[in-house]
A protein has these predicted regions:
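Bacterial Sec-dependent N-terminal signal peptides
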Residues: 1-20
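Buried hydrophobic residues that stabilize the cores of well-folded domains
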Residues: 18-194
Length: 194
C-alpha cells in the first residue's frame, strides 16, 4: 500500500482533476496588486488573477508549479482572457435571462449558480482546458467570482479563426447548449442555489 501511494505521488499532474480558484472583477482588470497577495499566490499556486494585459500564461504553469515553493520573485499565473469571456457569457445566460430578475434584484443580493461539464474551453489557438464543474457567485447582478474544477489540459484545440460559439439557454431543462457554427458542441447542466 505504501509503495502504491509512493507511485501515485509521481503521476503526471495532468492526469488528476485539480481545483482552480479564480477571482475576477467586472472589467477583467487586475484586482489585487499587493505584494503579500502575490506572495500567497506563488506559495499556494491555487489562485489565478485575471489580467487584461497581453501576458499569456497557461494553466499548464499552474499544474507545473502548484506543489512547489517558488522563488520570492515568483511567477504570476494569469488566466487567459478567452476562458473569462466564455464563462462570463454562460453566467450571463444563466443569471440575466430576464429583465424582471435584473430590475427586481435586491441590493447586494448574492446568488450561487453551479454548472456541470465536461465543458471544453479554448485557451488560445491550440490550447484547451476541460472543466468538470464551475460555481458562479453573483452579487447585485454582477459576476464577482467563480470556482472551477478542471480535469484536463490539452495542447490540441480548435483554431480561433474556425470558431463561432453561440450559447442557448433552456430554463425548462436547466441546460446551456453551446453551438459552434450552428453545430451542437456541448451541453452543460446546472443547478441554482438561492
Amino acid at each position: 500500500m505504501k509503495y502504491l501511494l509512493f507511485l501515485l505521488c509521481f503521476l503526471p499532474l495532468q492526469a488528476l482533476c485539480q481545483d482552480v480558484k479564480v477571482i475576477i472583477n467586472e472589467d477583467f482588470g487586475l484586482i489585487y496588486k499587493s505584494d503579500t497577495l502575490y506572495a500567497s499566490l506563488v506559495a499556494n499556486g491555487d489562485t489565478i488573477f485575471i489580467s487584461d494585459d497581453d501576458v499569456s500564461w497557461h494553466l499548464q504553469d499552474l499544474l507545473r508549479f502548484q506543489n512547489q515553493t517558488l522563488k520570492e520573485e515568483g511567477i504570476y499565473i494569469r488566466y487567459p482572457d478567452i476562458i473569462a469571456m466564455e464563462i462570463e457569457q454562460i453566467a450571463t445566460l444563466l443569471d440575466y435571462k430576464s429583465e424582471v430578475n435584473y430590475k427586481n434584484a435586491i441590493k447586494n443580493e448574492r446568488r450561487t449558480i453551479t454548472f456541470y461539464g465536461p465543458i471544453t474551453l479554448m485557451l488560445r489557438k491550440s490550447h484547451t482546458v476541460t472543466i468538470k464543474k464551475c460555481t458562479l457567485v453573483i452579487e447585485n447582478n454582477k459576476l464577482i467570482k467563480y470556482h472551477c474544477s478542471y480535469c484536463q489540459h490539452d495542447d490540441v484545440g480548435i483554431p480561433t479563426e474556425n470558431t463561432k460559439f453561440e450559447y442557448k439557454y433552456d430554463e425548462k431543462d436547466r441546460i446551456v447548449k453551446i453551438f459552434n457554427k450552428g453545430k451542437l458542441e456541448q451541453t452543460i447542466s446546472y443547478v441554482e442555489q438561492q
